[in-house]
Amino acid sequence: LWHAVWPRMRPGDFRVNSADGVGADWPLDYAELAPFYARVERQFGVSGLAGDPNFPAEIDFPLPPLPLGDGGWRVARAQARLGWHWWPHPCAIHSAPYDGRHACVQRGTCQQGCNEGAKASTDLTHWPKAIAAGARLVTGARVRRLETDAKGRGIGATWLDADGHGHFEPARVTVLAANA
């Protein structure tokens, strides 16, 4: 289920082996990825509150945070009494009108679908713009393999359509999103 919770990895998450001797360090660091986090947060219209001391100070979300509501405030007060740090989590749900879509009306039906279009998803944020720019959306397809040239560079993808027929789609750039 897509809850629209919008986490960022922290700088230390990229170097767990160096810091803690477990796992593997990433081949890139937070600073390299940060501009892309910000870009996608703008594309989706993320609501959040800047200033969380667990994250770098430069984070600034395109929309203010969603209201916590009575239950959220109850949890926040309980955590504060225990001395725990709490912060409203960023969400890809619009707290105000954004990019032609409406704000959340706090109906609480997020999992059944958002009639206002306030809960961001690629069918609202990216597909319409890509199709308007000439992209073709193929549904019911499954990529079998990313194809490479003799030097190992991606040249396209072999995929199956809904009827099981194989196709090859050449591409200048290939991306393995891995359900991202």
Indicate where each model-derived feature is located:
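Conserved beta-strand-loop-beta-strand element in the redox core of flavoprotein oxidoreductases
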Residues: 145-169, 174
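Flavin (primarily FAD) binding-site architecture
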Residues: 176-180
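Conserved redox-cofactor binding core of oxidoreductases
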Residues: 2-5, 13-143
